[in-house]
Amino acid sequence: DLWQWGQMILKETGKIPFSYYGAYGCYCGWGGRGGKPKAGTDRCCYVHDCCYGKLTSCPKTDDRYSYSRLDLTIVCGEDDPCKELCECDKKIAVCFRENLGTYNKKYRYHLKSCKKADKPC
């Protein structure tokens, strides 16, 4: 669910996810806006959108799943029916951490060059 997703991102990046990533680039934020992702951070959101689109179980973003942290690693519950959803959220949290250096404030609330046509997954 959104709270769990937010907690993963906060623990990985130290950033408050909804204010930091909520309206960033072409893909970060509810639903994405399409076009070419803006650098690494926005690419994380693009990949996350694609991951959600490929879910075969628990396709809803409000479904809860089990996960823990082992040392500094996110571990999704092995037998959880929503493990795929957890793995998508884990990937974006780790991607955001790995791409903290690509975050550019000029892409906050950036809609100008976002096209309607999505880049195919």
From Swiss-Prot:
Ca(2+) binds at Y27, G29, G31, D49. Coiled coil: none annotated. Snake venom phospholipase A2 (PLA2) that induces blockade of neuromuscular contraction in an indirectly stimulated chick biventer cervicis nerve-muscle preparation. Does not inhibit contraction of chick biventer cervicic nerve-muscle preparation in response to treatment with acetylcholine or KCl. The neuromuscular blockade is mediated by inhibitory action at the presynaptic motor nerve endings. Lyses skeletal myoblasts and myotubes in vitro, and intramuscular injection causes local muscle necrosis. Induces edema in the mouse foot pad. Induces a transient increase of IL-6 levels. InterPro entries: PLipase_A2, PLipase_A2_Asp_AS, PLipase_A2_dom, PLipase_A2_dom_sf, PLipase_A2_His_AS. Belongs to the phospholipase A2 family. Group II subfamily. D49 sub-subfamily. Its EC number is 3.1.1.4. Expressed by the venom gland. Its cofactor is Ca(2+). The keyword Nucleotidyltransferase does not apply. PANTHER family: PHOSPHOLIPASE A2 FAMILY MEMBER, PHOSPHOLIPASE A2, MEMBRANE ASSOCIATED. Disulfide bonds join C26-C114, C28-C45, C44-C95, C50-C121, C51-C88, C58-C82, C76-C86. The active site is at H48, D89. It catalyses: a 1,2-diacyl-sn-glycero-3-phosphocholine + H2O = a 1-acyl-sn-glycero-3-phosphocholine + a fatty acid + H(+). GO terms for molecular function: calcium ion binding; calcium-dependent phospholipase A2 activity; phospholipase A2 activity; phospholipid binding; toxin activity. Binds 1 Ca(2+) ion. It comes from the Eukaryota. This is Basic phospholipase A2 BmjeTX-II. One of its GO terms (cellular component) is extracellular region. Its main location: secreted. It is an enzyme of class 3 (hydrolase). It is found in: Secreted.
